[in-house]
């Protein structure tokens, strides 16, 4: 997974 730190700072697998 990738940490979407630019979308809130939560780990989001995309």
From Swiss-Prot:
Give EC number(s), comma-separated: 3.2.1.1
Q: Where does Ca(2+) bind?
A: 7, 10, 12
User: Could you name the domain of life of the organism this protein comes from?
Assistant: Eukaryota
The GO terms this record gives for MF are: alpha-amylase activity; metal ion binding
Q: How is the cofactor bound?
A: Binds 3 Ca(2+) ions per subunit.
Keyword Hydrolase found: yes
Cofactor(s) needed, names only, are: Ca(2+)
Q: What are the UniProt keywords, alphabetically?
A: Calcium, Carbohydrate metabolism, Glycosidase, Hydrolase, Metal-binding
Reaction equations catalysed = Endohydrolysis of (1->4)-alpha-D-glucosidic linkages in polysaccharides containing three or more (1->4)-alpha-linked D-glucose units
The protein's enzyme class: hydrolase
Q: Which residues form a coiled coil?
A: none
The family note in this entry says:
Belongs to the glycosyl hydrolase 13 family.
- Outline the subunit composition: Monomer.
Q: What is this protein called?
A: Alpha-amylase 1
